[in-house]
């Protein structure tokens, strides 16, 4: 580019390029760089229409040739729209992620190991009395010689309205004991026991409690 005839420039010296020339040179460098690094055949936003011109589907602009389109892709409008599209896609992926994780966790929860039951365990029920208070209670000793390795029996108190074996009687509740691979067993007890205690000393599981009474029927 000849800058010799510019005002204020010495003859034979290099002139200072103006804004338009500098900007044009910059666009040309970007275009050449884009030609070397961008494969237009893989650009999802480039479309050649029936008139032979090129369209940017992201910005809805029309371009006479590939060079014009490449120049457009380096501009502010195209880069801004690309950033917005990427942000939108990231947001959608984050919204979908919890649903996928939730589906996986639910599938794990629903998986239940199938255990072949081997029948009811042997047990012994005894009436007991606390020496200090004189209160009476019950002791349950249940045998689990074939319990699963590292397993431990469990118990829970069931209300009369949860069971389906007898007509509900609010004066009673049920002590339910379970241990794989044995069948669960239940004992009908008075409604309000006091002190409660359990102990597992394989193969015997012991449960005992005392009523707030000084006699027991």
From Swiss-Prot:
Gene Ontology annotations of biological process type: mRNA cis splicing, via spliceosome; spliceosomal complex assembly; U2-type prespliceosome assembly
Pfam families: SF3A2, zf-met
Database matches in PROSITE patterns: ZF_MATRIN (PS50171)
Origin superkingdom: Eukaryota
A single MF term (Gene Ontology): zinc ion binding
Localization terms from the record: Nucleus; Cytoplasm
Keyword terms, alphabetized: Cytoplasm, Metal-binding, mRNA processing, mRNA splicing, Nucleus, Spliceosome, Zinc, Zinc-finger
Zinc finger (Matrin-type): 54-84
GO CC list: catalytic step 2 spliceosome; cytosol; nucleus; U2 snRNP; U2-type prespliceosome
KW Transcription (keyword) present: no
Complex formation: Belongs to the 40S cdc5-associated complex (or cwf complex), a spliceosome sub-complex reminiscent of a late-stage spliceosome composed of the U2, U5 and U6 snRNAs and at least brr2, cdc5, cwf2/prp3, cwf3/syf1, cwf4/syf3, cwf5/ecm2, spp42/cwf6, cwf7/spf27, cwf8, cwf9, cwf10, cwf11, cwf12, prp45/cwf13, cwf14, cwf15, cwf16, cwf17, cwf18, cwf19, cwf20, cwf21, cwf22, cwf23, cwf24, cwf25, cwf26, cyp7/cwf27, cwf28, cwf29/ist3, lea1, msl1, prp5/cwf1, prp10, prp12/sap130, prp17, prp22, sap61, sap62, sap114, sap145, slu7, smb1, smd1, smd3, smf1, smg1 and syf2.
Role noted for this protein: Involved in mRNA splicing where it associates with cdc5 and the other cwf proteins as part of the spliceosome.
UniProt family annotation: Belongs to the SF3A2 family.
PANTHER family, per the entry: SPLICING FACTOR 3A SUBUNIT 2
Protein name in the entry: Pre-mRNA-splicing factor sap62
UniProt organism field: Schizosaccharomyces pombe (strain 972 / ATCC 24843)
Gene responsible for this protein: sap62
């Amino acid at each position: 580019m000849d800058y010799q005839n510019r005002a204020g420039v010495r003859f034979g010296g290099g002139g200072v390029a103006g804004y338009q020339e500098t900007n044009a040179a910059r666009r040309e460098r970007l275009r050449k760089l884009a030609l070397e690094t961008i494969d237009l055949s893989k650009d999802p936003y480039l479309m050649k229409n029936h008139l032979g011109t090129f369209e940017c589907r992201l910005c809805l602009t029309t371009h006479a040739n590939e060079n014009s389109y490449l120049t457009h892709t380096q501009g502010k409008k195209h880069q801004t729209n690309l950033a917005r599209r990427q942000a939108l896609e990231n947001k959608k992926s984050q919204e979908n992620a919890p649903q996928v994780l939730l589906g996986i966790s639910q599938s794990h929860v629903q998986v239940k190991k199938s255990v072949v039951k081997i029948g009811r365990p042997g047990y012994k029920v005894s009436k007991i009395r606390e020496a200090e208070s004189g209160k009476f209670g019950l002791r349950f000793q249940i045998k689990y010689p074939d319990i699963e390795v590292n397993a431990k029996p469990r118990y829970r108190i069931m209300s009369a309205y949860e069971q389906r074996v007898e007509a509900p009687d609010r004066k009673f509740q049920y002590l339910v004991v379970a241990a794989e691979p044995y069948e669960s067993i239940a004992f009908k007890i008075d409604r309000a026991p006091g002190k409660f205690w359990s102990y597992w000393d394989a193969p015997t599981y012991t449960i005992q409690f005392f009523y707030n009474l000084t006699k027991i029927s």
